[in-house]
C-alpha cells in the first residue's frame, strides 16, 4: 500500500482553482489503486469564491477533499495540509500550489523514482515569476548554505514528493504558523543526509488571479526568516 496525498494551499484562487483541479484530479485517480489516495486543497480563508467552488467540485469528484481554515498565510496552510495528510495515513505526500504554474505532466517522473529516494524536489531552472522572484530564490539558497551548511539548487519549489514519515519527523521541529516550511523541509532532508534528488521542472507565469506575495511582503518575510533561521539552527 502506498497511499498518495497531493496537497495544495489556496488563497483567492477562484480564477484558477477549477482548471487546477481538472488538471490534477486524473493524477490522483491514476494513483489510487488502494482506494486511499486523495487530492487535498486547503483554503486559507479566501475572500472570494474559492472554497465554494472547491465544495462544488467535491460533489462529483470523490477523491477530492476540500478543507478550509482561517487565514494564516501560505506557510501555515502548507503545514496544515502536511499534518492532515499524515494523520489520514499517507505514505507519500506531494505538494504543489493551486495557481496553475506547475505542470501535472511532470509528476510521473517524480513518482517513478520514488523507491530510490526519501524526497524528490523540483528545481526551477527558469522561473515564470520573473527575475525578481528568481533573485529571491538565489538569496534563499545562499542563506540556507550560510546558516545550515547545505547546498541546494532550489529550496522552495512548490513541486515536491516526500515520504510522509520523514515529513512527520521534520514537521515536529516547526511551529504550526511557521511561514517558510518548504524551505526548512528541503533543508532538513539534505542536512540529515536523507536520500534526496532535485529534478528540473517547468514553472509557468501566473495566467490568472493575483499573487498574494509581493516584493514588499518578501522583504518582510525575509527579515523574519533571518531571525527564524538562527533559532532553528540551534535546534538541529
Task: Describe these PLM feature segments.
Residues 2-8, 17, 24, 37-42:
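Hydrophobic targeting segments
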Residues 43-52, 100:
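A conserved acidic beta->alpha catalytic loop
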Residues 8, 32-46, 67-70:
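Short beta-strand/loop segment that forms part of the nucleotide-sugar
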Residues 69-87, 92, 104-179, 206-216, ...:
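Acceptor/aglycone-binding surface of glycosyltransferases and processive sugar-polymer synthases
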Residues 13-16, 46, 74:
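Donor nucleotide-sugar binding loop of glycosyltransferases
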Amino acid at each position: 500500500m502506498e497511499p498518495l496525498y497531493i496537497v495544495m494551499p489556496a488563497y483567492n484562487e477562484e480564477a484558477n482553482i477549477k482548471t487546477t483541479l481538472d488538471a490534477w484530479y486524473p493524477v490522483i485517480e491514476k494513483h489510487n489503486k488502494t482506494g486511499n489516495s486523495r487530492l487535498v486543497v486547503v483554503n486559507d480563508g479566501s475572500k472570494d469564491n474559492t472554497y465554494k467552488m472547491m465544495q462544488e467540485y467535491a460533489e462529483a469528484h470523490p477523491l477530492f477533499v476540500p478543507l478550509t481554515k482561517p487565514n494564516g498565510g501560505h506557510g501555515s496552510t502548507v503545514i496544515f495540509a502536511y499534518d492532515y495528510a499524515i494523520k489520514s495515513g499517507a505514505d507519500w505526500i506531494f505538494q504543489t500550489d493551486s495557481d496553475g504554474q506547475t505542470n501535472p505532466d511532470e509528476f510521473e517522473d517524480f513518482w517513478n523514482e520514488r523507491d530510490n529516494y526519501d524526497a524528490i524536489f523540483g528545481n526551477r531552472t527558469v522561473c515564470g515569476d520573473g527575475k525578481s522572484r528568481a533573485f529571491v530564490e538565489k538569496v534563499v539558497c545562499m542563506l540556507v548554505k550560510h546558516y545550515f551548511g547545505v547546498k541546494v539548487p532550489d529550496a522552495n519549489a512548490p513541486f515536491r514528493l516526500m515520504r510522509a514519515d520523514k515529513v512527520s519527523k521534520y514537521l515536529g521541529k516547526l511551529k504550526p504558523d511557521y511561514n517558510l516550511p518548504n524551505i526548512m523541509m528541503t533543508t532538513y532532508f539534505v542536512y540529515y543526509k536523507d536520500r534526496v534528488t532535485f529534478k528540473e521542472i517547468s514553472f509557468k507565469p501566473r495566467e490568472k488571479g493575483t499573487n498574494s506575495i509581493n516584493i514588499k511582503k518578501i522583504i518582510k518575510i525575509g527579515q523574519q526568516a533571518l531571525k527564524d533561521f538562527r533559532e532553528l539552527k540551534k535546534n538541529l
